[in-house]
Amino acid sequence: MTLFESIVLGVVQGLTEFLPVSSTAHLRIIPALAGWEDPGAAFTAVVQLGTLAAVLIYFYKDIYAILAAVIQGIMKGRPFDTHEAAMGWMIAVGTLPIVICGLLFKTEIETSLRSLYWVSGALIGFALLLLVAEWSVKKRLKQNMSMTSMDTIGWKEAIFTGFAQCLALIPGASRSGVTITGGLFLNMSRESAARFSFLLSLPSVFAAALFELYHTWDIIASSAGSIAAITAATITAGITGYLSIAFLISYLKKHTTSIFIIYRIILGAGILSLIAAGRLQP
């Protein structure tokens, strides 16, 4: 992988990691269209350290408040004393499903599930599921039902969203896409669903990145070019990832996810068309 390719893929990773359009799908598609080598699931996981940094920087106040509350709660012997403390434990419990599924299906995730048929199917299928979630939100708003905010998220929302996050292991599904969808089904506001989605992603993204870095370090370290490429991709992913978070949080305050639903369906259909025309190899 050249330095130029790594920077391009880093930008793509950062821009698409937090939008509900699937960064994995784009990292699978763009190299195929450009005639580049598939960077692989390990590259994606390691570069996510950049987007992880973006979340840490953007939500540093929330993260500090949660960690401080968890520590104080443990020291006082009342681990769920405040909502911030409970939020920390909810994020921890909500992370367990994807960790277990990720380890159980690691081989499939890195091989057969990276087929463009799976990617396009996930793009379209989960777009339709997000559409149904938006319909449910619209129906509840017509009934003047109050929406769940970050201050009122409970164990039900955390556990359900945690299981929904497992679907993000399917390339094309989108981590933010499936967790925001889960949040909308549970009556969370779009902004709150996105915020909780990003906070919930922290432990699993960090663990996955370290896991892949540990298992691929010998290959990476054997080439100065590999280290430079991954470093460049990680830095660009972090910068563009921060901008992507800021955009999505602001956008969802006033808009639905319709634009992302339409984009996913068009992209998924486009991939299938290119495969049928022989322009892409599945």
From Swiss-Prot:
Report the EC code(s) recorded for this entry. Answer: 3.6.1.27
Q: Membrane-spanning regions, if any?
A: 1-21, 40-60, 85-105, 117-137, 196-216, 229-249, 258-278
A GO cellular component annotated for this chain's UniProt record is: plasma membrane
What membrane topology does this protein have?
Multi-pass membrane protein
Main enzyme class: hydrolase
Q: Which sequence ranges form a coiled-coil region, renumbered to this chain?
A: none
Which keywords label this protein?
Answer: Antibiotic resistance, Cell inner membrane, Cell membrane, Cell shape, Cell wall biogenesis/degradation, Hydrolase, Membrane, Peptidoglycan synthesis, Transmembrane, Transmembrane helix
- Compartments in which it is found: Cell inner membrane
Q: Which domain of life is it from?
A: Bacteria
Return one GO MF term.
undecaprenyl-diphosphatase activity
Keyword Lipid biosynthesis in annotation = no
Which biological process annotations from GO are given for this protein?
Answer: cell wall organization; peptidoglycan biosynthetic process; regulation of cell shape; response to antibiotic
InterPro entries on file = UppP
Q: Which Pfam families match?
A: BacA
* Additional facts recorded: Bacitracin is thought to be involved in the inhibition of peptidoglycan synthesis by sequestering undecaprenyl diphosphate, thereby reducing the pool of lipid carrier available.
Family label: Belongs to the UppP family.
- Family annotation (NCBIfam families): undec_PP_bacA
Q: What does this protein do?
A: Catalyzes the dephosphorylation of undecaprenyl diphosphate (UPP). Confers resistance to bacitracin.
Protein name as catalogued? Undecaprenyl-diphosphatase
Organism, scientific name: Chlorobium phaeobacteroides (strain DSM 266 / SMG 266 / 2430)
